[in-house]
Amino acid sequence: MSRISRQAYADMFGPTVGDRVRLADTALWVEVEKDFTVYGEEVKFGGGKVIRDGMGQGQMLAAEAMDLVLTNALIIDHWGIVKADIGIKHGRIAVIGKAGNPDVQPGVNVPVGPGTEVIAAEGKIVTAGGVDSHIHFICPQQVDEALNSGVTTFIGGGTGPATGTNATTCTPGPWYLARMLQAADSLPINIGLLGKGNASRPEALREQIAAGAVGLKLHEDWGSTPAAIDCCLGVAEEMDIQVAIHTDTLNESGCIEDTLAAIGDRTIHTFHTEGAGGGHAPDIIRAAGQANVLPSSTNPTLPYTINTVDEHLDMLMVCHHLDPSIAEDVAFAESRIRRETIAAEDILHDMGAFAMTSSDSQAMGRVGEVVLRTWQVAHQMKLRRGPLAPDTYYSDNFRVKRYIAKYTINPALTHGIGHEVGSVEVGKLADLVLWSPAFFAVKPALVLKGGMIVTAPMGDINGSIPTPQPVHYRPMFGALGAARHATRMTFLPQAAMDRGLAEELNLRSLIGVVNGCRRVRKPDMVHNTLQPLIEVDAQTYQVRADGELLVCEPASELPLAQRYFLF
């Protein structure tokens, strides 16, 4: 039997079982757990390579073969870190296994035929497209920025750069919901809209859900009173949608105890649960320990650095329509920015108490940095806290699975769309992101949306090859014309489907129906299930989890930063 060195094999076909890969310039390493390919029967495209007629490519018709195969990919997902070929059919993940020609090769379950396209994923990492569950729809150009960062699904609300949208993630009322659903139909990203949940009577909330809202947002700027919270959650229980909440920073209508009492044992998604983005001062972070609370962070506080506090004050004044000449407005802003709770947030993420990360796009958050900042936290926590059991200093597989779940499967489960997106699993939309390991979490090699390339780095269009400088991200064919509608999904609640809303609005995109929102609990948050007793000292703001004081120094230097953004 012919043999080649492990290094030569990795150079040709990508890493295999036991090989380790560093994630960009972080301190994180992953080790390949399983290889679905067959040694000696690997498929690869190119001159003199395997995927040729009668060799790695068979004679089957399109109905029997894949539309697209990603060869020799290193998949990093919440369920594993494995090497495999990925078969895509009709825009969905069809098979994860061994590609090739079953007529002449053993073990093939990803058949390649004359109708099959190939993306070479040797030496590349493949992850699921990110799910950003805290979007202010302030401008449509956010979509380009998000796609170029590896995010393929938006959950949020808004109507453009209106004052209400600049502060709150709400698309209020049936008329605006209809217009935003029609606008979203032309954007090459999956979208679900949140309606305004601040009401003390249920009728106006029910009509928003029937008009297409997949969830309701309670925001203190509209009045997150106990009455509004109770009413909103009552409608959510009735109509199986999620509720997201930004609680009362000023504690005017009640404190954290009153909000938790109003919520009861009902599931709720708490936004920026640390509090700098808003919420009961100084102890909204306590909510992260509740079994029915699904806590997320927004990315400006992630990770805690020497610049975090200074940046937040200016952001807050703009986003919440505050006046720096009014003492009460300044006091409101300062009450939300606490070094101690921001530092504790990173540690609670590493412990698995905080389950999700998100952006808060253009409203105290950066839409293109959800993926990047999540991994910066993971890096910092490895440096500060060492390996997470059962990891060793040689690999960080468990920590990597915990952190990737925060912006993929967990927000998808939270908002009832986990059956369509959020992981690299058979049957789900082929929303996939390819990364060169050196650029992981920073700059994707290309992004697939529903099986088509939607964005990618591209060189000089008049060049004789695709790679001459200047290279920058450009929209691809998946972002154009009717291809958008065949590869993107609009999410709707069952109540909107029952009334035929998609047909009424002439929506041309794929439709996904949210379900199971009310059954999701903290134990369902993949790799992020911890429910500690969290205590905050009202005078010093020190945070303890199950009695442990949570403190860490701010970072003065980070990976995934200036090294990658000279241009």
UniProtKB/Swiss-Prot annotation:
GO biological process, one term: urea catabolic process
Predominant cellular place of this UniProt entry's protein: cytoplasm
Pathway(s) the chain acts in: Nitrogen metabolism; urea degradation; CO(2) and NH(3) from urea (urease route): step 1/1
Residue sites binding Ni(2+) 1 per the record: 134, 136, 217, 360
Cofactor(s) listed: Ni cation
Localisation per UniProt entry: Cytoplasm
Active-site residues per Swiss-Prot or TrEMBL entry: 320 (proton donor)
UniProt keyword Signal, yes or no: no
SUPFAM superfamilies: Composite domain of metallo-dependent hydrolases, Metallo-dependent hydrolases
KW Transferase (keyword) present: no
Assigned EC number: 3.5.1.5
Broad enzyme group: hydrolase
List of residues binding Ni(2+) 2: 217, 246, 272
GO molecular function, one term: nickel cation binding
Residue positions where N6-carboxylysine is found in the record: 217
HAMAP family per the UniProt record, alphabetical: Urease_alpha
Name of protein: Urease subunit alpha
Taxonomic lineage: Bacteria, Pseudomonadati, Pseudomonadota, Gammaproteobacteria, Pseudomonadales
Gene field: ureC
